[in-house]
Amino acid sequence: MKKFLIIIFGLVLTINAQSKVGSTAAPFLNIGIGPRAIAMGTAFVATSDDITALYWNPAGITRIGGNSAMFNKTSWIADINYNWAGAAVQLGDLGTIGLSVNQLDYGKMAVTTNAEQDGTGEYFSAQDIAIGLTYAYQLTDRFSIGGTAKYIQQKIYNSSASALAVDIGVLFNSDL
């Protein structure tokens, strides 16, 4: 019994130790897409049935009801622009494929140093981008499954970082 309690205690400690690891990587991926989803307070994963399902739940693109595309540009403060584009094509009994691109462009910024705080005359830019390829399949009239493979890149001045990610989603329509 004592060994069992020690093992449980050790497992609980390791769960808490990882709670904030990586919590700041690619935060631009948390910016929601689509007016309907945003109006619902981003509670859209279970109801995703339009082209924005490429962002919210890849399984949802099976519910679009045809081929679809959407382009979105949001101008934020300080010349920051957020762009999103997505397209999905239904392949009949083979499923549905989609492509999406998220881009956050911070615009041009002046290079400053401790000695030249008003700027050196040089400018640099920063940009985040994610490109996703999605496949979804409707297993039954109520149940769909889908996945997205993403390439993510963040650039600022002369530095960049990139990663690969996978999103997997299921969608069950209960008709309630």
Annotated model-derived regions:
Residues 4-15:
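Sec-dependent N-terminal signal peptides
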